[in-house]
Amino acid sequence: MPRSPDSYHDPVLLHECVDALVRGPGLYVDGTLGGGGHSMAILRALESGGWLEGSLLVGIDQDDEALHEAGSRLAAYPGRAVAVKGNFQDIARLASREAVQKGLEPRARAILLDLGVSSRQIDRAERGFSYMRTGPLDMRMDSSASTTAADILNDADERELAAIFFRYGEEPRSRAIARAVIAARMKHGPLSSTEDLADIVRSVVHGRQPSIRSLSRVFQALRIAVNRELDVLQRVLEDGVSVLDEGGRIAVISYHSLEDRMVKQYFAAQSKCDWGPKGVGLREPLSRGTLVPVTRKAVVASEDEVRVNPRSRSAKLRVAEKTGGVQ
């Protein structure tokens, strides 16, 4: 897949998302706008299908740089696309507001969530997301948020740090790394840079490949903790489904097992029917599920896409469709 000319990073599983979501006119919501790559592809598909008239794409992001980049691209579709600053946990309110202002029904035809950190954010050392670049221990998706990675590393005790590294990073050496962080704080004072943290992890986990894996897990864990990503994901799944129209679809791209597991379990739980107590033998369920999985299992990137865009290697796409069941 060639690099998209209108995105500041390669949008992952682009064709798979468009094929699953674009099926007619209506309200389309990109809850993780980023550079606008997915949104632009959706708009082009709507245009080529003759569905642009009567459609609106709402792109949501809390990153000011992303909004600036994507907003300039969405301007190519005046009146049909809008970039909105906000956290995607407010997806229903933000999308409904924009739809009503444009005279559309506040029910979404499709919702897309591309989770995780964009390549642009990782590449910017001052954002503090990567152990490969020296920068401040920040890791905030929303630069106006109060808590940084440095705050957590310097304020939490050993038990709290170990819990963060284990729960959010699934790091097997979580306790040893937490002890090393506390020791470094006592010896050298507060941690301030990504290099400080990377050096601590390397002092505990030896060997190039093991240390790289642990570095990835520890930095992931801190990013999730700083941005409360799993709590937010649970809310955005519930909020997103609530604003979906009957027959509307929600597509979620995740990049690590914690996110994918949460999405899989949520879709499965919402697809179950309530047949009442065992032994009653009802002919019809008391209530039907609100979702039907469109993808039986997670969709992964092709070998060709992974070759062109290595970031797609860990991506998993799950899609579900809203039914007429009672939520």
UniProtKB/Swiss-Prot annotation:
Write out the GO cellular component annotations: cytoplasm
Say which domain of life the source belongs to.
Answer: Bacteria
User: Which biological process, per GO, is one annotated for this protein?
Assistant: rRNA base methylation
| Gene3D superfamilies in alphabetical order | Putative methyltransferase TM0872, insert domain (1.10.150.170), Vaccinia Virus protein VP39 (3.40.50.150)
Q: Give the catalytic activity.
A: cytidine(1402) in 16S rRNA + S-adenosyl-L-methionine = N(4)-methylcytidine(1402) in 16S rRNA + S-adenosyl-L-homocysteine + H(+)
User: Which UniProt key words apply to this protein?
Assistant: Cytoplasm, Methyltransferase, rRNA processing, S-adenosyl-L-methionine, Transferase
- Where in the cell? Cytoplasm
Question: Binding of S-adenosyl-L-methionine: at which residues?
Answer: G36, G37, H38, D61, F88, D114, Q121
Cysteines paired by S-S bonds = none
Top-tier EC class: transferase
- EC number(s) given by UniProt: 2.1.1.199
InterPro entries assigned to the protein according to its UniProt record, in alphabetical order: RsmH (IPR002903), SAM-dep_MeTrfase_MraW_recog (IPR023397), SAM-dependent_MTases_sf (IPR029063)
Any transmembrane segments, and where? Answer: none
Query: HAMAP family per the record?
Result: 16SrRNA_methyltr_H
**Function of the molecule:** Specifically methylates the N4 position of cytidine in position 1402 (C1402) of 16S rRNA.
PANTHER family this protein is in?
A: 12S RRNA N4-METHYLCYTIDINE METHYLTRANSFERASE (PTHR11265:SF0), S-ADENOSYL-METHYLTRANSFERASE MRAW (PTHR11265)
Q: Any idea what this protein is called?
A: Ribosomal RNA small subunit methyltransferase H
